[in-house]
Amino acid sequence: MKQFGLAAFDELKDGKYNDVNKTILEKQSVELRDQLMVFQERLVEFAKKHNSELQASPEFRSKFMHMCSSIGIDPLSLFDRDKHLFTVNDFYYEVCLKVIEICRQTKDMNGGVISFQELEKVHFRKLNVGLDDLEKSIDMLKSLECFEIFQIRGKKFLRSVPNELTSDQTKILEICSILGYSSISLLKANLGWEAVRSKSALDEMVANGLLWIDYQGGAEALYWDPSWITRQL
């Protein structure tokens, strides 16, 4: 409804204030991003200049990386293996830390199972970390009993929860790797399982966060691999 008098004036004034605030926030955001880029370039220059000291002193190196993290700059973005900036072991150590952080942040979403492909294409996409780098880094995590590497149809996955996957769960994930989901009828058609066995395995995987259940697809519930859903978000 159109406003008249003082109410209309207040509405117009509020609209102008909102526009001004939005413009100021956008300008500040651009300025902050530009300042961060400049500061990151300066940090790289500093690291190159003092590279020998950084390599020689773990304490100096640790403080430098902590400073980077505290201001929102990922230390991985500063590594340059071609120019021997820091050491290769430091690079893999930082990748390990980031993998652990990613597993912790996504555990409630994927039940503690994440593919190497998702790690590379989604979480490390902007950091120039390849599959070989991930494999070498994650190999360093094998000493931690809660990390395990396994394969499904030739693709590598990382499990970061102490509960091992059962053979039934692995077979269900194999089907999910093809279609993105599984169901009681799919398991019966492909594996010959009875409905009780299928529902028990599927419900347990839902409870552990390995699958998400969807009742909207039709008469039968579908059990989705979370990575197929999150990649569309």
From Swiss-Prot:
Highest taxon, organism lineage? Eukaryota
Q: Which GO molecular function terms does the record list? A: lipid binding
What are the record's GO terms for cellular component? Answer: ESCRT II complex
What does the entry give for GO biological process? ATP export; negative regulation of transcription by RNA polymerase II; protein targeting to vacuole; protein transport to vacuole involved in ubiquitin-dependent protein catabolic process via the multivesicular body sorting pathway; ubiquitin-dependent protein catabolic process via the multivesicular body sorting pathway
* Protein's cellular compartments: Cytoplasm; Endosome membrane
**Is the keyword Nucleotidyltransferase in the record?**
no
InterPro entries assigned to the protein according to its UniProt record, in alphabetical order: ESCRT-2_cplx_Snf8, Snf8/Vps36, WH-like_DNA-bd_sf, WH_DNA-bd_sf
Q: What else is known?
A: Present with 1040 molecules/cell in log phase SD medium.
Oligomeric state and interaction partners are given as: Component of the endosomal sorting complex required for transport II (ESCRT-II), which consists of 2 copies of VPS25, 1 copy of SNF8, and 1 copy of VPS36. The ESCRT-II complex interacts directly with the VPS20 subunit of the ESCRT-III complex.
> Any idea what this protein is called?
Vacuolar-sorting protein SNF8
Q: Which species?
A: Saccharomyces cerevisiae (strain ATCC 204508 / S288c)
Name of the coding gene: SNF8
